[in-house]
Design a protein with these regions (language model features):
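C-terminal, non-catalytic "cap/extension" segments appended to globular domains
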Residues: 5-40, 45-52, 215-318
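Catalytic glutamate of the conserved HExxH
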Residues: 130, 134-138, 142, 153
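Long, amphipathic alpha-helical stalk/connector segments used for oligomerization, subunit docking
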Residues: 167-255
Length: 318
């Protein structure tokens, strides 16, 4: 295979499939792809926002002390031990602030352990929002079975609730809006990459080696393969692009990582859905507590039921 065309692409995807075969995403590829496609049509993800560099500038300055006060004040309003957990984590050094220069230093970035989080300090509300997001990850990330599915949803939901909290405290509504837009712009920008990589991952998993010669077979069996119609020119263009990206990357995940992108997709879609429900905060906190249980005491069906998703019809609410 090494001497065959597109060997980087094929070998790389084979490696990826083997590494992630037990994940929810890879184990349910056709189902995941249907969700991604439906969401793209429903929300017109190619044109969700018009967010550019000018929109990223926040107006209101927030000091480091004020940032921590905001985080602790928000957590204190939640039922449970969240404030105590954050205080303990912070005092143990699991959250650190760095500026842009320090964050780009490999030595400093390497200091961050698996359970540590660095916050690129900007002196704006984005700092406290990031802390809230990463803090909730830290609470449930050890549940290797369910965290890949639910952790992003919980963190994105809670960061939005935190932005609601900032609004009640009189912080800049423009900055709050920009902060929300940043999340959804990132989401819409990643969607196109996610659907392309998912389609080709699924195709590789079903038919084996991908190259120009496989196009005719694929085009004849698009429905059975759950693969969208592409011209041969577009098909080859994607093959060449992915092959080159994988060839020039040290790790497959640097060039091709749809499982990771899928977490953000599910997290953004379902957190947005839950934000429309009045009792959603209670549901999400209950789900977070469920993920904090020993892994062997949790299962995916129970987790979905906690947030009101009882069957496939509910799951496909979009």
């Amino acid at each position: 295979v090494e001497n065959m065309k597109y060997s980087n692409l094929n070998d790389g995807i084979d490696e990826y499939l083997k590494k992630y075969e037990d994940t929810f995403y890879v184990s349910n590829l056709d189902f995941a792809i249907d969700l991604i496609r439906t969401g793209g049509k429903k929300f017109n993800l190619r044109n969700t926002t018009n967010y550019n560099a000018e929109n990223q500038c926040f107006e209101e300055k927030v000091s480091g002390v004020e940032t921590l006060d905001l985080v602790t004040s928000f957590l204190a309003e939640l039922d449970g031990d969240y404030l105590q957990c954050f205080t303990k984590s912070f005092n143990e050094g699991r959250f650190d602030f760095y500026n842009d220069l320090e964050n780009n230093d490999k030595k400093i970035r390497g200091i961050c352990s698996y359970e540590g989080y660095t916050v690129n300090f900007n002196g704006t509300i984005s700092d406290s929002r990031t802390i809230i997001h990463e803090f909730f990850h830290s609470l449930n990330i050890k549940n290797y079975k369910l965290a890949p599915i639910f952790s992003e949803m919980i963190s994105i939901f809670m960061e939005n609730k935190f932005l609601d909290f900032l609004n009640t405290k009189g912080y800049s509504r423009n900055d709050i809006a920009k902060s929300r837009l940043a999340r959804y712009n990132d989401f819409s920008g990643a969607w196109n990459r996610l659907i392309i990589q998912s389609n080709f991952l699924n195709l590789k998993n079903k038919i084996g080696y991908l190259d120009e010669e496989s196009y005719d077979f694929i085009s004849m069996h698009e429905k059975e393969l759950n693969f969208p119609h592409l011209s041969k020119e577009d098909f080859i263009e994607v093959l060449e692009f992915l092959d080159d990206r994988i060839k020039n990357s040290e790790k497959i995940e640097q060039a091709f990582n749809p499982e990771y992108s899928f977490r953000y997709y599910i997290g953004t879609i379902y957190s947005s859905y839950l934000l429309l429900q009045e009792d959603s905060l209670d549901k999400v906190l209950l789900l977070n507590e469920y993920l904090r249980k020993p892994v062997e005491e949790t299962d995916i069906e129970s987790a979905f039921r906690i947030i009101g998703i009882k069957d496939e019809t509910d799951f496909r609410f979009i």
